[in-house]
Amino acid sequence: MAGHSHWAGIKHKKGANDAARGKIFQKMFKEIYVAATGPGGTDPSSNPALRLAISKAKAKSMPKANIERALDKAKGNAKDGAVFTEIIYNATISGGATFLVITLSDNVNRTTSNIQSYFNKQNAKLGKTGTIPFQFDHKGIMEISKSLVDEESLTIVCLENGAEDIEATDESFIITTSVEDFSTCKSAIESNLNITEFMQCEITYLPNATVTFTGEKAQKIQDFIAKLEDDDDVQEVFHNIEFEE
């Protein structure tokens, strides 16, 4: 199964310094809290959204104590009673680059104003809130270190449990699934291959076609993405750009 996901080419990783890790953990705290306060409740075994949020947090090396604090807050054991709402924004800038920005906000007006301000500087207007641009497909992604499993064994399990694609990079295998088959495939990998650690494990948005930016333009857009990601209300930034040096 060849690499059609574009995942390795377009994902935008932050630096692994303390400030960046703290920002990531803050965002994951909110995601776990929102999942736990949803209709599924605070028990991961009966709440698929919460189970996924915790798996995603663990893949990002979020400490167990932080995860437990998010669950405690959801159970009403914390003093901060902020309520977060998910808002999805989209915009297309010059060059055909399309962005999908997922936010969790306790002040929708503030968040909308901030996101619009970022895109105003790119001479772009926001699309209809909550709309997913046709340039993106909603998919499940799991990334596993090559040190944990051989390709043949992984391929057999994944093919039998709904995987759409397996991509081999220098250090890892990246499995793509439909949203519907994600949990089944993940459970099969965990039980049949004794995998407990994932480098990535989430429901995400993948571009079905990309545009390429190079040189100075690429650097400016990377700086723009970093600014978006640094906003406290922004959980995820997805785009359809491939950067070439």
UniProtKB/Swiss-Prot annotation:
Record keywords: Cytoplasm, DNA-binding, Transcription, Transcription regulation
Major place of residence: cytoplasm
GO biological process: regulation of DNA-templated transcription
Name the record gives this protein: Probable transcriptional regulatory protein MAG6590
Molecular function via GO: DNA binding
Pfam families membership: TACO1_YebC_N (PF20772), Transcrip_reg (PF01709)
Cellular component GO terms, alphabetical: cytosol
InterPro entries membership: Integrase-like_N (IPR017856), TACO1_YebC-like_2nd/3rd_dom (IPR048300), TACO1_YebC_N (IPR049083), Transcrip_reg_TACO1-like (IPR002876), Transcrip_reg_TACO1-like_dom3 (IPR026564), YebC-like (IPR029072)
The family this protein is said to belong to: Belongs to the TACO1 family.
Subcellular location: Cytoplasm
Gene3D superfamilies: 1.10.10.200, 3.30.70.980
